């Protein structure tokens, strides 16, 4: 079983800053200490994967009800994430901080604690996600035009992100994507790269 949280979705279930486990694989016992064996035992007893997913969702909802109410810090981060996502990661962190009415440093501290990474890095991920969703997977691609449209300074800036997130340059990535796509059924372009969870 696995859980994919939104960028600010995991914090209510943890008692420590997300920066301590960001982009890492950690044992369930290290994350949920006292609950780990309880949930593990319950999941082993279910008859099917579907039943396990239902059980796990119920378990998460119960834990969520036990957590304190949403804080001002969580509201700030939620607002910032929504603004970044709406602008596909192109909104400057300084402008965002000014909109919210807090310093960039304070916003950075909140993001490290509640999201696990910096606001700048999350914006970078949203911008790259926008690139992947903007690319035609069946027609020729003008990478320079894509870079400009998605808020990159130039093509080398886009290439740097491609290599960082996928291990390939844009052309090789698209070639691989087209090879593994079959007929009219195209794979989700995000499935071919390892973006830190959103």
How should these model regions be labeled?
Residues 111, 123, 161-162, 174:
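DNA major-groove recognition helix of helix-turn-helix
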Residues 1-94, 98-104, 117-118, 133-137, ...:
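Alpha-helical bundle regulatory/interaction domains
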Residues 114:
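Major-groove DNA-recognition helix of helix-turn-helix-type DNA-binding domains
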Residues 2, 122-125:
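Intrinsically disordered, low-complexity sequence elements enriched in Ser/Thr/Gly/Pro
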């Amino acid at each position: 079983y696995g859980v994919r949280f939104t960028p600010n979705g995991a914090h209510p279930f943890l008692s420590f800053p997300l920066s301590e486990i960001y982009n890492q694989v950690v044992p369930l016992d290290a994350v949920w200490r006292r609950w780990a064996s309880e949930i593990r035992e319950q999941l082993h007893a279910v008859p099917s994967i579907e039943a396990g997913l239902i059980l796990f969702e119920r378990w998460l909802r119960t834990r969520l009800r036990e957590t304190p109410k949403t804080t001002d810090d969580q509201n700030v981060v939620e607002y910032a994430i929504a603004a970044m996502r709406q602008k596909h990661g192109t909104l400057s962190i300084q402008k965002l901080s000014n909109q919210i009415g807090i310093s960039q440093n304070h916003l950075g501290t909140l993001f490290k604690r509640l999201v696990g990474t910096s606001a700048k890095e999350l914006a970078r991920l949203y911008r790259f996600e926008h690139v992947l969703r903007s690319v035609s997977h069946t027609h020729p691609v003008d990478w320079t035009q894509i870079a400009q449209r998605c808020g990159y300074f130039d093509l080398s800036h886009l290439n740097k992100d491609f290599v960082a997130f996928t291990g390939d340059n844009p052309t090789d990535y698209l070639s691989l994507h087209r090879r593994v796509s079959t007929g009219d059924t195209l794979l989700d372009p995000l499935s071919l790269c390892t973006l830190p969870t959103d």
